[in-house]
Amino acid sequence: MAIVKCKPTSAGRRHVVKIVNPELHKGKPYAPLLDTKSKTGGRNNLGRITTRHIGGGHKQHYRLIDFKRNKLDIPAVVERLEYDPNRSANIALVLYKDGERRYILAPKGLSAGDQIQAGVNAPIKVGNALPMRNIPVGSTVHNVELKPGKGGQIARSAGSYVQIIAREGNYVTLRLRSGEMRKVLAECTATIGEVGNSEHMLRVLGKAGANRWRGVRPTVRGTAMNPVDHPHGGGEGRNFGKHPVSPWGVQTKGKKTRHNKRTDKYIVRRRGK
């Protein structure tokens, strides 16, 4: 993995910082594990914008990732590591002993030729998936389930991980990267290690067009709009004379956004600000 700063051969290249990984496969992805991915432009079925700043971008195929890791007690070999345009992490194509191939998230330290396994009796080794009741306290894991059998939902982006800090009865206590501590059923599956490609956060796109290739449209400040378009719009100068709000008038700084009271009891400590 190398961090490359481009030479300023043009204004658009001047600030570009790229992440170069020579281990990544340079050919086409594995076709049977691809699916179509249609663009919405941030619109719903009525044609109305429901998510701003989405539109355009390069055409992509969705890679079918095995988040469940439910092929138990069958060893697999990592065939290659690949780039995935749909996520910040890289992915690994693994070949199971029975001939099936699947994509998984590529953990840090996993290389082509490594052996991995999922199941209760899998050894504690990077890339192996097993129930958290079988993982030692203090271990670093990723792709953590919230419900047994549902598939990993926590710690899936590049460089992310969760630490198991306690085990009591049917629950384990996890420390998330945000600082939040929460309880999860010990039967839930997690994968050993942290997600790879942690240098992703160091990249610099360098120009607006690179964001447009990714399907991200510009963000316009509310204070630069007219009063008809935003509560901060209009007036003389840049002052809008009120507490900051979203385009729909909802407080935008410090307002609580969590509504799932049903699972509040599993949160031991809130994340730090």
Curated annotation (Swiss-Prot):
Keywords: Ribonucleoprotein, Ribosomal protein, RNA-binding, rRNA-binding. The keyword Ribosomal protein applies. Residues 221-273 are annotated as: Disordered. Transmembrane segments: none annotated. PROSITE patterns: RIBOSOMAL_L2. GO terms for biological process: cytoplasmic translation. One of its GO terms (molecular function) is rRNA binding. The keyword rRNA-binding applies. It comes from the Bacteria. SMART domains: Ribosomal_L2 (SM01383), Ribosomal_L2_C (SM01382). GO terms for cellular component: large ribosomal subunit. Residues 253-273 have a biased composition (Basic residues). Pfam families: Ribosomal_L2, Ribosomal_L2_C. Belongs to the universal ribosomal protein uL2 family. Part of the 50S ribosomal subunit. Forms a bridge to the 30S subunit in the 70S ribosome. One of the primary rRNA binding proteins. Required for association of the 30S and 50S subunits to form the 70S ribosome, for tRNA binding and peptide bond formation. It has been suggested to have peptidyltransferase activity; this is somewhat controversial. Makes several contacts with the 16S rRNA in the 70S ribosome. This is Large ribosomal subunit protein uL2. It comes from Mannheimia succiniciproducens (strain KCTC 0769BP / MBEL55E). The gene is rplB.
